[in-house]
Amino acid sequence: MLHVTFLAHSGFLVEDGKRCYVFDYYKDPNNIVWQLAKRGRELWFFVSHTHGDHFNPSITEFDGPQTRYICHQDVPLESKVKKCITMRPGQDALLDDVGIHMYGSTDEGGSFYVKTNTANIDSDSIFHAGDLNWWHWLGDTPENNADAKRMAWREFKELDGLAVDVAMFPVDNRLEDAMEWGSIEFLRRVQVNKAFIPMHLNGPLWTPSVYFKALFGEVPIWEPQKDGDEATF
């Protein structure tokens, strides 16, 4: 069972009953993570890349015996906290009984797949995309958008056959008519069992298009309505 709390933008807290996994902490208007830290909960911070809307250097303030940091290799944290590992796309890590694989990105950094207990085949799994998306900008040049498509196809191909329980993926309003393209290609390749969660909206809440619903009407979707919303899967 996973309890998911939307912090803001692309930031999420995922609790599995033992640990608190914090993905791309940018801001936490409701001080949810601080409350957990004060209660001595085990906090694992995942940082996909250094963009200011995915990485807040203040996460070093949570450092302590119950805190770990798992970061893309470009994130400058390793010398500033006690327990930090850095990863690059294609790399695996095993920390305690938690399995982590870093997939690629179509922008900076990488994306995370987390298996909460590698000793139990039925344990929960989490995918956080970071800035992995099909970044097709309607006002951009045909050449740039062709490059964006090639990059997206290259990274999505690595995900073929993956199954996850909860997946957090960008559905960015700034892409206008192309805002769902990345999520469509992602879901064509990845089986999401419990919740597909849109993030990185940069605008109003997402209403899935008729086309999206026709393709993925059976995919469970949870869309947070505001910072601090939570659900259990």
Predicted regions and their residues:
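Binuclear metal-ion centers of metallo-dependent hydrolases, dominated by the metallo-beta-lactamase
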Residues: 4-10, 81-95, 158, 179-233
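Active-site-proximal beta-strand elements of phosphoester/diester hydrolases
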Residues: 3-6, 21-24, 98-105, 123-131, ...
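Pre-active-site segment of Zn-dependent metallo-hydrolases
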Residues: 11-50, 57-61, 132-161
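Metallo-beta-lactamase
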Residues: 68-123, 218-233
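Active-site-proximal loop/helix segments of hydrolase catalytic cores
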Residues: 108-189
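Active-site environment of divalent metal-dependent phosphoester hydrolases
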Residues: 28-31, 50-55, 75-79, 91-93, ...
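Active-site neighborhood of phospho(di)ester-bond hydrolases with catalytic His/Asp-centered motifs
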Residues: 22-26, 41-55, 70-74, 127-131, ...
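Active-site HxH/HxHxD metal-binding segment of metal-dependent hydrolases
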Residues: 32-93
